[in-house]
From Swiss-Prot:
InterPro entries: CASP/CASPL (IPR006459), CASP_dom (IPR006702), CASPL (IPR044173)
UniProt KW keywords: Cell membrane, Membrane, Transmembrane, Transmembrane helix
Protein name: CASP-like protein 1U3
Stretches of the chain found on the membrane's Extracellular side: 46-70, 135-158
Principal localisation: membrane
Source organism per UniProt: Physcomitrium patens (Spreading-leaved earth moss)
Spans within the Cytoplasmic topological domain: 1-24, 92-113, 180-190
Subunit structure: Homodimer and heterodimers.
Family named by the database record: Belongs to the Casparian strip membrane proteins (CASP) family.
Subcellular location: Cell membrane
Length: 190
């Protein structure tokens, strides 16, 4: 120790720093996912319509289609997860140590985000298939389009599908944020 100072090496990994941007983006995206799934569920639940026909009243309900039931269930699952994720993101903003700060919980967050994204796109695409046939019919199977008859029902279903697509985009972006947090944790590992 003859007065020589040791220069720090810039190639060494430093301590893991807190990244408030991950938590802020995560909170915003989870709130948007929450709002989109609520809108999709409410629109689908309000989509019942009864119209008079020659054979008596005809009621179009989401409960009559298994694809629409899965649509409501899938959106409900993501709604619960988004609500819990929003709480976790709020806590991580205040405590500076949230689920994206530790490797194990960041992996769990990433996997849950990915599964919820898959559930949303599955529910949305299944309902979209039924809605497409309802709007355009299937001429080779002699299925007529029902949307000219129950137009309000179809409008609500269309709104729910648009909300689910928005929810999927927000949930997929949450998955990207979780993957980015995992990348930061992996590159700053000692």
């Amino acid at each position: 120790m003859n007065g020589a100072t040791v220069q720090p090496s810039y190639k060494e990994a430093g301590p893991v720093r807190y990244h408030p941007m991950h938590d802020c983006l995560s909170l915003i995206l989870r709130l948007l996912t929450l709002g989109a799934t609520i809108a999709a569920i409410v629109a689908m639940l309000k989509s019942t319509q009864t119209v008079p026909t020659l054979l008596g009243p005809h009621t179009a309900r989401w409960k009559d289609f298994p694809a629409f039931e899965w649509f409501v269930i899938g959106n409900s699952i993501v709604l619960v997860y988004a609500a819990l994720g929003t709480l976790a993101a709020c806590l991580s903003l205040f405590t500076r140590r949230g689920p994206l700060s530790y490797t194990k919980t960041a992996w769990l967050t990433f996997l849950c985000d990915f599964i919820c994204s898959c559930a949303l796109i599955s529910a949305g695409s299944t309902a979209l298939g039924v809605a497409w046939i309802g709007k355009h019919g299937q001429h080779s199977a002699f299925w007529n389009a029902v949307c000219p008859t129950v137009d309000r029902f179809c409008d609500y279903v269309q709104g729910a599908l648009i909300a689910t697509l928005c929810g999927f985009i927000f949930q997929a972006l949450s998955t990207v944020i979780a993957a980015s947090a995992l990348h930061n944790l992996a590159t700053h590992r000692h």
